[in-house]
Amino acid sequence: MANPQGSPPGISRRGFLRGATVLGGGVVVAGWGLSPWIGNVFHRRGTFVYPDRPPMWPGVDTTYSVCKQCHSDCGIEAHVFGGVLEKLDGNPYHPNATEPHAPYSLDPAVVALWPAPHSLCPRGQAGRQTVYDPYRITVPLKRTGPRGSGQWEAISWSMLIKEVTEGGHLFAHVKGEEHRHVSGFRELWDGGQARFRSIDPANPDFGPETNGLVIYWGRAEAGQADFLTRFGHAFGTINVFPHVGICDLNHHVATQESLNGMGGVAMLKPDIPNAEYILWFGENVTEANFPMQTLGRKLVAATTDNHLKYVMIDVRTGNGNLHANRWVPIAPGGDGALAMGMIRWIIDQDRYNGEYLARPNAHAAQAAGEPNFSNATWLVITDPGHPHDGAFLEAAEAGLVPTSASTAKEPVVVDPGSGQVMPASQTQAAALWPQHGKSGSIKVNGIVCQTAMQRLYTETSRNTVDEYAKLAGVSAAVIVSLAHEFTSHGRKAVADFYRGVSQHTNGVLAGRAIMVLNFLLGNVDWTGGYIMGGGAGDYLGKTPGAPYPLDTWPNQPAHIPSGVPISREGAFYEKSLAYQAAQKEGRSPFPAPRPWFPFGFGI
C-alpha cells in the first residue's frame, strides 16, 4: 500500500500502529513502576488522596445529598475517607443524575452496582473544590468600613443573633455612623404592638410598622425559602423577597401572564422524549439551563434515535449545536421579532390549530378532549373612545344581561353559525374571524370589537415578514422555513425560551410572542408538547396526613401581612391611596414617586 502523504518512507500504517501499541504498553509498565510518584499528582497538603478509591473500600463513607453548584439540584454521592471529601459522583437514586434511577427501596450497600450511569457534570465535581476553598465564607461578616469599602470582620453566630435582635449603635466604629441607631427585631416588634401601627400614617395602605423588616436572600431551596417566608409573615412583614429579580423575572412574568396567572405556573418545558421539533430560543441547552445534564441526556437520546429535530436560535454557537439540525444566529434582542414574523406567516397561511382555538371555555375544551382552552374567540373592545378600550367585552356591556346579573362580567363570543353574540360559557365553539375576515371588526351594542385572534393578527400585521426579518437579523426565508417546519408536526412541536430572550428590556413581550407560537399549535399539556413539571416537596406539610404539618401549626399567623411591598411589586399604583388622593386634589398622579411593578415578584 502506498504511504500516506507526508509519512516517513519505509513505515506502513500497519507498522506504525503496531509500534505505537508496543510503545504504549511500555509506557504503562514504566508508569506502574513509578506509581508512588503518580500518586503525588493527587494530594492535599501532603496526604495521598486516591482519586478513584472504590466506595465499598473499608473506611469510605458514602453520603447521599443534592448538589448546590447550580440550580439544577442534581443528586450527589459524596465519598468521604478519613474525614476528607475525596470525590463526588451522581446519586443513583436521583432522576437528574441517573436514568432510570434506582428505587429508594434498594439497599445502599449494593446501589453502586446499579447498571445505569449515575453522572455528575464537571461543575458538580468541582463541589469538592468549593468545600475546601480557603475563601469560602463559613461565618457571619460584619461591615467595618463605609458602605462599598469592602471592609469586613468575622463575628460569631451568637453575636449576630444578639445584634440583629437587640439593635443599637452597631456601627459606632465606622466614621460617620458613630451615632446611627439601628433598630433590632425586639424594638421593631415592640411586643407585637407594631403590627397594629401604620408604617406611614399618610398612606395607611402601606401596612404596619413591622413592614420595616425586610428579608432578602439570594438562591435558596424551596424548603429554606418556605421557612424564611414563614418567619417574615409571622413577624408581620410583607417584605420577604427571593432572588427572582436578578435571575429571570422577565421569563416568569411572560409565562404567567400568557397563562393568565393560573396556578402561579412560571415554567413550562418541552416533552423532549416525545417531541418531534423544538425551537430553543436563547436557551443554551447541553451547556447551561437546568437541570443541565438531564436536559442534555434526554436531548442526545432523542436525537440519536432520529425522532427529534431541534434548532438553536442564539447569538452564539455552542455545544448544543453538536446535535442540532440548525443554528439561527439571531441579532441580540431580535427573538421577539422572529417570533412575531412566524406568527404573521402562520396566520396568513392558516397553519394554526383552529379547532383548539375555537373552544371558548373549559367545558367545551373537556368535551372536545382538550386539556385546556384559550381566549382566542373572546371579543376585545377596539374603540379608542371607549373607557374600556383594549379590555374584553363583558356580557353586560354587550347588552346580554343586566349589570346586576352574576354573569355580567362574563366574556362574549360570536356564534360561528348564526353570527349572534353570546356569553362565552354558552357555546361549544366560537368564531375566530366573525363576518369580516382576519382584519375586520364588528359592532356589539354600539361598541366596536374584534376577537382576540383578530387583535393578534392586527398587531402582527404592523410589519411584513421581511421587516420582521430585518429586525431579527435573519432573512425572510429563515422565518418562513422555521414557521413551516414548526407547523408540520401537529402538537409535537415546541418553542421554548429562557435568559437569552428575557434578559432584555423587551424580554417580557418577546417571551409572550414565543408563548403564542405554542398556543397557535394547542400543544400545552399534550404528549410531545409544552408541559408542566412534577411539582416539589411538601416542606411545610400541607398535604393531608403529613407527619409535620408546619403550615397549620396552632396559633400561628396564617395570613400574608397587609401593605405594599417596599419593592412596589405585585401592586398597582392606580389602586394606591396616594394615587387616589392626587386625583381628588385635581393633581396629576404621574409621574409616580417611585416605579411600581404590578406583574413582578422577587424584585
Question: What label would you give each PLM region?
Answer:
Residues 2-355, 359-434, 475, 553-596, ...:
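N-terminal export/assembly segments and adjacent metallocofactor-ligating motifs
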Residues 151, 178, 182-183, 443-450, ...:
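Conserved alpha/beta enzyme-core scaffolds, especially Rossmann-like or related mixed alpha/beta domains
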Residues 209, 235, 460, 482, ...:
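A glycine-rich, hydrophobic/aromatic-adjacent loop/helix-cap motif
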Residues 213-221, 467-474, 497-505, 536-539:
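Conserved short loop/turn motifs at secondary-structure junctions
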Residues 228, 465, 514:
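Generic structural marker for isolated residues within well-ordered, non-membrane alpha-helices
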Residues 262-266, 436-454:
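Active-site-adjacent structural elements in folded domains
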Residues 271-281, 456-472:
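Conserved thiamine diphosphate
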Residues 468, 479-482:
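Structured secondary-structure scaffolds
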